[in-house]
Each structure stands twice: as C-alpha cells, then as structure tokens.
C-alpha cells in the first residue's frame, strides 16, 4: 500500500507537459544517483539489491557509490542511503544495434522506507500517446553538463516507432528494443545518463540517447524495458547477492 501510494503521488506531482520542474521531494523513491567522484548518472532501483541504468553509466564497481533516497545532491537530508556497488553487468553487445542497458548490484541491500522504494518492472509495453514521467539530475540547458542540484521531472508523450525512426541519427541503428518519447515542445534534453521514464507506475524506459537541448524538437530514445524482464531476471539469478561480497565488473550477453 505504501509503495502504491508513493507511486501515485509521484506521478501526480509530475510537471505540466513541456515544462521542467523540480520533482516534489522524494516523490520518486526509486531514483538512484550513481557516482564515482568524477561523473554521476541516474538509475532505477528495482530490487533491494539491484539497480538498472544505461550502458553509458557502466562505472567501475569498486569506485562507485549508489545514493538512494536523495533529492538535493548538495545537502545531506538524513533520508539518503549511501551503498557501495559490488558488481556491474553490462548487456552486450552495446549498440550493435541491440542494447544499451546495465545492471548494478549493491554490496548491501537497500532498506525500504517511504524515501526508498523499488519501481515495478513493466508488465506491458508503452503505447503511442501515453503520457509518462521522466526524472533525472542532468542539466536542462544547452552546453551545461553539470548535474542539477535537485531532481528534475518532466512529462512526455510516447512517440510511435515510425516518427522516431524518421528523426533517428544516421550513425545509430533503430531497434525494436527502443522506445521514443517527447515532441517539439516537450522533450527530455537532460544531459543525464540513465534518466528514468515511468509510465502508469511501471519502469518503461531508461535513457539511451537524446539530441540534447540544442535540438529539443526530436524525441529522446529509451531502452524499452518491457522487453528486458527475462534478461533482468536471468542476471539476478546468475549473480546472487551476499551480505559480504567482493567487487567486480562483468559483461554478459543475453541468453536467447
């Protein structure tokens, strides 16, 4: 009941279409900040041991900390859980043209409370026109790459595949494992790896590619999470957590 209430409140607090706003504090309890002292990116907590993020966020395990329950990156609010990363599993091959996804295993389990909750995996695929919420700490201004201090949110419509293909960069390949969201006056141009897209209370996208704030008329591309449930469960089964564990970085392909 607590999780459902938090999810409902979180999506209800999303910004009006086309406008970036600060998320209501702690309204996205699944949002994770991954950082290694040099760079940071977003991810989604899906289990007390596991985070899913983009390939671009495949940081080195032994140097990376996952911060859960955060809102303002510059202030310790007392809600944060800072947990070392134990293992990083990259879905390969990357952009070949199939996948851009990484799973991160925590060295210690997350402690669920009102500020830290997992987001449910997708039980269906998103539909064109469906309105979703995207959140992340990335910059929303051109040529500014420093992370925002506070978590930002925007609501975006899912775009049909053909419209997305028509705006897709020639140097990337279109794949059925992608989903696009955004339009000319509402796009996710956050320069934040692993920004999270939630539709109807379910994890439907992790940012794969966007055109940046210089070109917001084109939709952003996300990994289509509804097609990755089998892979996610395979990774979790093959890499069982331990209360005390060594750290490593691993690359694994999908078992077909």
Swiss-Prot record:
The keyword Signal applies. It comes from the Eukaryota. Disulfide bonds join 23-153, 41-57, 125-226, 132-199, 164-180, 189-213. GO terms for biological process: proteolysis. SUPFAM superfamilies: Trypsin-like serine proteases. It holds the Pfam family Trypsin. PROSITE patterns: TRYPSIN_DOM. One of its GO terms (molecular function) is serine-type endopeptidase activity. The keyword Transmembrane does not apply. CDD domains: Tryp_SPc. Residues 1-14 form the signal peptide. GO terms for cellular component: secretory granule. Transmembrane segments: none annotated. PANTHER family: KALLIKREIN-1 (PTHR24271:SF47), KALLIKREIN-RELATED (PTHR24271). Belongs to the peptidase S1 family. This is Trypsinogen-like protein 3. It comes from Pseudopleuronectes americanus (Winter flounder).
């Amino acid at each position: 009941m607590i999780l459902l209430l938090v999810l409902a409140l979180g999506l209800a607090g999303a910004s009006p279409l086309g406008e970036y706003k600060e998320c209501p504090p702690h309204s996205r309890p699944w949002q994770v900040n991954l950082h290694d002292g040099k760079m940071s990116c977003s991810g989604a907590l899906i289990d007390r041991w596991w985070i899913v993020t983009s390939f671009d966020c495949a940081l080195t395990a032994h140097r990376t900390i996952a911060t859960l329950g955060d809102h303002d990156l510059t202030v310790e609010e007392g809600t944060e859980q800072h947990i070392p990363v134990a293992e990083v599993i990259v879905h390969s091959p990357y952009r070949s043209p199939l996948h851009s996804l990484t799973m991160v295993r925590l060295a210690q389990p997350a402690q669920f409370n009102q500020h830290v909750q997992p987001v449910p995996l997708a039980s269906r695929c998103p539909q064109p026109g469906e309105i979703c919420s995207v959140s992340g700490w990335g910059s929303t201004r051109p040529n500014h790459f420093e992370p925002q201090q506070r978590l930002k949110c925007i609501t975006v419509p899912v775009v049909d595949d053909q419209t997305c293909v028509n705006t897709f960069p020639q140097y990337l390949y279109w794949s059925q494992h992608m989903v696009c969201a955004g339009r000319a006056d509402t796009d996710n141009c956050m320069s934040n790896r692993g920004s999270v897209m939630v539709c109807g209370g379910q994890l439907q996208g992790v940012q794969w590619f966007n055109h940046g704030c210089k070109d917001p008329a084109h939709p952003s591309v996300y990994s289509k999470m509804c097609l990755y449930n089998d892979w996610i469960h395979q990774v979790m089964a093959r890499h069982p957590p331990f209360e005390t564990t060594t750290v490593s970085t691993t690359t694994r392909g999908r078992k077909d």
